[in-house]
A protein has these predicted regions:
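A solvent-exposed interaction/effector surface
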Residues: 1-158
Length: 158
């Protein structure tokens, strides 16, 4: 399951401190209504398909990948759609932002079309605020479908 949480700022334009504050707010919102919830990992973000395709790298939605039921009026629950996903990995948000245009280009060059929102999933994270960086392992993923080949309708006419 995906639990989605709207925020007012673009995740990709946040400083380390801003990101950490928003992340803590997200966690507090969950714990407020689910005091025994203790699996706060695999947090990420969702970028609408249209933003990803137009290279407007703007995400204002945190997501938590978890199968444990979470109850909260501000969270939207959804299921990760079945299908094929293009996947790439990186080590930081800075690297992710640099790779996003190439990731999109690679998908298109392989003959696929984007059919879902872009998902960033932080698989591993260890903050180091003293050094102003985070030790991370990020999965970049987007649902894809095979492009329909153009065909000539005149071929079928007599």
């Amino acid at each position: 399951s995906l639990y989605r949480f709207q925020i007012d700022s673009n995740i990709y334009q946040m400083s380390t401190e801003e990101y950490e504050l928003h992340l803590r707010c997200f966690k507090q919102e969950i714990i407020q209504y689910n005091p025994f919830f203790n699996h706060f990992s695999r947090v990420g973000s969702i970028m609408p398909k249209e933003n990803f395709i137009s290279q407007n790298f703007d995400s204002k939605e945190f997501t938590l990948f978890d199968d444990e039921p979470i109850y909260h009026s501000h969270l939207t629950k959804s299921i990760l759609p079945e299908g094929n996903y293009a996947i790439r990995y990186c080590k930081s948000f800075e690297e992710e932002i640099k790779l996003l245009p190439q990731f999109l280009l690679d998908i298109r060059e392989q003959g696929y079309q984007i059919i879902g929102d872009y998902l960033c999933e932080v698989i591993h994270e260890q903050p180091s605020l003293e050094e102003q960086k985070r030790d991370m392992f990020i999965r970049m993923q987007v649902r894809i479908g095979k492009k329909v080949k153009n065909f000539n309708l005149n071929h079928f006419r007599n």
